[in-house]
């Protein structure tokens, strides 16, 4: 459990708190209210101080019984890794993921971002044009939930790992459990809303999972901090995937994954039609 590894982390309902596991945190089924204390991260509060306030929060359900998206609780995974491995979360991911996959320019943290000679600056809308804005450092504090710096080349390598092309680095024994449904959610909870063709939505371990049209088990996640938008979707069975990175808060990010999936569906339809000729 989380409290057995991190005894200084307390919860208001000690019975539920003592049941809370890493799996609950990663599958967004902690039982705490949606986005518990994310606003404190927005306000640039120290991460340790935010965690110390978890003891004041009422659970809305027992752990494992309901879905509610979290960033702070999710980031306890990093504290557990540090406690168990003796390595910081950032160093651990570098050693276990970035290096084996050859993600040579991927890193964590604002200092690494600023040290890169080839970095994209964030942009926000100002009227009908995009203007540069300062990097917001707040979310680098919750590294498991945010804070990766990576190029599209890095992310293409990560994508290949996720669809099983690099089993020397990410074996199926790792991929299958993290990409499988753990916590079911509703159209009101699932990020996609009520969208035609989207069905069977759930959260895995760090990933959203859904069916689309006649195809099953798409895996997806997106990101949004001031001046940046990202999306990634893939299907290991179909051996397809797409990564979208933008140094702006473009509206295109809201629809890009479904435009990609629709293109794939049309290609499948064309292939089926060609076989019938």
Show where each model-derived region lies.
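Residue-level recognition of oxygen-bearing side chains
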Residues: 1, 72, 154
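Active-site helix/loop module of the DD-peptidase/beta-lactamase fold
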Residues: 1-33, 37, 55-58, 83-122, ...
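Second-shell loop/turn segments in exported
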Residues: 10-13, 36-41, 62-66, 79-83, ...
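Mid-domain, small-residue-enriched loop/turn segments at the edges of structured enzyme/sensor domains
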Residues: 21, 72-73
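Short coil/turn segments at secondary-structure boundaries
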Residues: 38-41, 67, 109-113, 190-194
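Catalytic loop of the DD-peptidase/beta-lactamase superfamily, centered on the K-T-G motif
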Residues: 45-46, 82-95, 99, 117, ...
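The feature captures the short pre-catalytic strand/loop hairpin that immediately precedes
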Residues: 48-60, 126-140
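Well-ordered alpha-helical segments within folded domains of soluble proteins
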Residues: 73-78, 156
